[in-house]
Regions:
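A short, structural micro-pattern
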Residues: 10, 209-212, 293
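Alpha-helical segment that forms one wall of the substrate-binding/catalytic cleft
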Residues: 107-120, 209, 213-284
């Protein structure tokens, strides 16, 4: 089952259970008679529960390009997808080299364009009056600010300023390919994570290690599996070969994937940036309003947000965002909420 289906599955099942439990004439089932839900009932309920504009926007935003087409993307190629050409018009390879001078060699400009191309909604064209180029610039500034915090060198003594020290780490510090015992406690086939995303094994029959790899430092089988499903339509490829998240264009696609996919109950970062997400009354009561600060909530709110003061990590993200925004000509309004303190 693809991730688009997974987005609504729990809501669908819950809705069916509620509908069935509300039927006045339905007899109670004994514990020895498990309830059976037909696939057609699930499909009908899914359609009913997802037939509204926001869900349609989510489904549209997570559409992906076939990998065979992604592999053809190269800088300057006339046949590149429209969203890739937009990025190329805003961010040249020379800009990439300037902004990320300390990057690991695997984080190439070509790989970044492929990662963008995989998700056509990123830097895509809006036909409802929104400024597509402006949204793309803000998307890149936001994404790069989080790159700098997640994989940055954070070495203040260098001549290169910290905001330009992103993408230093390809693999989690202290881990190498083939190393055993990394982030695979949930591989146990007796637990639901191990059943849903069955871990690959090495030649010795030991579970593979799912330590942090790529620009998002993707970790654990329960993150590799969904990412693999989005990339291949199958959970197995990256569960069997997690090293691909470091050694191929997946190293940057993993971060774009996280940018595009909502983290329920949080919206996607893309929908925060492009204005699709608008805070409701409860959001506003909790201090959640449109702006860069909400993207910090999405990416690491449990650790960095909610205190009386901004913590060190969120302050870094804010500082990096301002620098990237300035470079990419993204206006930062004085009243934009950039942080996530209480």
């Amino acid at each position: 089952m693809g991730l688009q289906k997974t987005l609504a599955l729990s809501a669908v099942a819950a809705g069916i259970m509620l509908s069935l439990s509300g039927a006045q004439a339905a007899p109670l089932l004994s514990s020895s008679e498990p309830m059976t839900i037909n696939a057609s009932d699930l499909a009908a309920k899914e359609k009913a529960l997802t037939d509204f504009p926001l869900m349609e926007a989510v489904k549209s935003s997570i559409q992906t390009l076939d990998n065979s087409a992604v592999e053809q993307i190269e800088p300057g190629r006339a046949a590149n997808p429209a969203n890739v050409r937009r990025v190329e018009s805003i961010l040249k390879e020379a800009d990439w080299d300037y902004l990320f001078p300390m990057r690991a060699p695997e984080y190439t400009y070509s790989n970044f364009l492929k990662a963008i191309g995989k998700f056509p909604a990123v830097c895509g064209t809006y036909t409802d009056g929104r400024d597509s180029d402006a949204i793309c610039r803000k998307t890149l500034a936001t994404m790069f600010a989080h790159f700098a915090q997640e994989t940055g060198g954070h070495e203040s003594w260098r001549d290169i300023p910290e905001w330009r020290q992103a993408l230093v780490y390809l693999r989690e510090v202290g881990w190498t390919e083939g190393q055993k015992g990394g982030y695979n406690g949930e591989c146990n086939p007796d637990v639901w994570q191990g059943q849903t995303w069955p871990c690959g094994k090495d030649k010795d029959g030991d579970f593979l290690s799912y330590f942090g790899r790529g620009a998002k430092q993707l970790s654990y089988n329960y993150n590799y599996g969904p990412f693999s499903d989005a990339m291949y339509g199958d959970v197995r490829p990256l569960l069997d070969k997690p090293e691909l998240v470091a050694d191929t264009w997946m190293n940057l696609a993993s971060a774009v994937f996280f940018f595009v996919y909502p983290q329920p109950p949080k919206p996607s970062m893309l929908h925060v940036i492009d204005g699709t997400w608008q805070p409701n009354d409860r959001d506003k009561a909790n201090g959640l309003v449109s702006g860069f600060g909400v993207t910090i909530q999405i990416i690491n709110g449990g650790v960095e947000c909610g205190g009386a003061d901004e913590n060190a990590q969120s302050l870094n993200r804010i500082a990096y965002y301002k620098e990237f925004a300035n470079y990419l000509k993204v206006p930062v309004p004085a009243d934009e909420v950039l942080g996530c303190k209480r």
